[in-house]
């Protein structure tokens, strides 16, 4: 990693890492990253994929080998008490466009850092579910952490705080019209980048009630996932979940705010964490050939564990 804001990081919390998937050339992505970065790592399988993926991924060459999808923790320092907990699915993963076996998880490890031991948690909350279900998933994680030895803790990952109830297309369509009536510009400016203000308030309230903070640990109000009406890839992926007749309405609404909409889906939350420098959201992260490395923008945080 040569990006100045990413290189030399002591700990990485990554989600959606493949092991033997055609879309990533059947690599064990976590192991390769750990080897190249010279970091320790822990990998937690999440799904066994029964097809190549969704959207544009369905058209890649080759076939899956191991067909595993998961999340990982990386550390330059020893990791201890490594374990994962399962999170309940928000819908039957065999009924969606992308058929999979398994469920999302949270991966947990204690990091023996020279400045002090702390606990790192990487998690991926459900996208195709209700907001209440994401809140439930976070509650399960927090309940588990409360049963562990109390040490400074950082939780991070893709929490899919889209503001939508996406259990099915019907609920998502109803949610679309609700946002239209609230005012397209209002929602795009005041809710998608700030899901904690209203739509996803329950999830963030759960964190705060357990003593976790999040606003000062993130570049608050800056989107990490972007939809552009001109993106063929984004629209191809969206067609797996939304009926074709919806697209003129989606284009119309997005066009009201310049054709591009950004939402904050990726977060850090911490307890007994002291921020050292301003958190950042890194836009337009690309490889040497100009290809986007992820559909989400990475987020960074410099911190030290503080006394409890």
PLM region spans:
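N-terminal, active-site-proximal structural segment of metallo-dependent hydrolase catalytic domains
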Residues: 1-59, 63-68, 295-298, 304-308
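Active-site beta-strand/loop signature of hydrolases that rely on acidic residues for catalysis
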Residues: 1-26, 74, 109, 119-123, ...
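Active-site neighborhood of phospho(di)ester-bond hydrolases with catalytic His/Asp-centered motifs
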Residues: 12-15, 42-45, 154-158, 213-218
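Surface-exposed cleft-lining segments at the edges of enzyme active sites
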Residues: 17-19, 87-98, 123-131, 190-191
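Active-site environment of divalent metal-dependent phosphoester hydrolases
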Residues: 19-22, 49-52, 92, 127-131, ...
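Alpha-helical elements of Rossmann-like donor-binding domains used by nucleotide-donor carbohydrate transfer enzymes
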Residues: 32, 136-141, 202
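Beta-strand-turn-beta hairpins that frame and shape the catalytic cleft
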Residues: 66-67, 71-81, 100-124, 275, ...
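Metal-dependent phosphoester-hydrolase catalytic domains
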Residues: 84, 131, 145-154, 161-308
């Amino acid at each position: 990693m040569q990006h100045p804001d990413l290189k030399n990081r002591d700990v990485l919390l990554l989600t959606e890492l493949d092991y033997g998937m055609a879309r990533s050339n059947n690599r064990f992505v976590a192991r390769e990253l750990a080897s190249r970065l010279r970091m320790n790592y822990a990998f937690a399988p999440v799904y066994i994929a029964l097809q190549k993926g969704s959207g544009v991924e369905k058209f890649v060459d080759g076939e899956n080998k191991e067909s595993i999808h998961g999340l990982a923790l990386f550390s330059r320092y020893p990791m201890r008490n490594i374990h994962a907990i399962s999170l309940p699915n928000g819908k039957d993963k065999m009924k969606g466009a992308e058929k999979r076996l398994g469920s999302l998880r949270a991966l947990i490890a204690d990091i023996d850092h020279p400045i002090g031991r702390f606990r790192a948690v990487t998690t991926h909350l459900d996208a195709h579910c209700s907001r209440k279900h994401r809140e439930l998933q976070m509650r399960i994680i927090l309940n588990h952490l409360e049963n562990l030895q109390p040490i400074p803790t950082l939780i991070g990952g893709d929490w899919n705080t889209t503001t939508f109830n996406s259990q099915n297309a019907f609920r998502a369509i109803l949610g679309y019209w609700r946002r239209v009536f609230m005012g397209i510009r209002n929602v795009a400016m005041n809710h998608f980048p700030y899901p904690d203000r209203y739509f996803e308030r329950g999830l963030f309230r759960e964190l705060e009630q357990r003593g976790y903070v999040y606003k000062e640990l993130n570049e608050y109000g800056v989107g990490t996932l972007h939809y552009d009406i001109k993106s063929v890839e984004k629209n191809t992926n969206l067609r797996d979940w939304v009926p074709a007749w919806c697209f003129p309405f989606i284009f119309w609404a997005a066009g009201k705010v310049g054709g591009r909409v950004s939402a904050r889906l990726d977060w850090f939350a911490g307890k007994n964490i002291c921020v050292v420098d301003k958190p950042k959201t890194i836009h337009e992260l690309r490889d040497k050939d100009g290809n986007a490395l992820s559909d989400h923008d990475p987020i960074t945080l410099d911190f030290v564990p503080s006394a409890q």
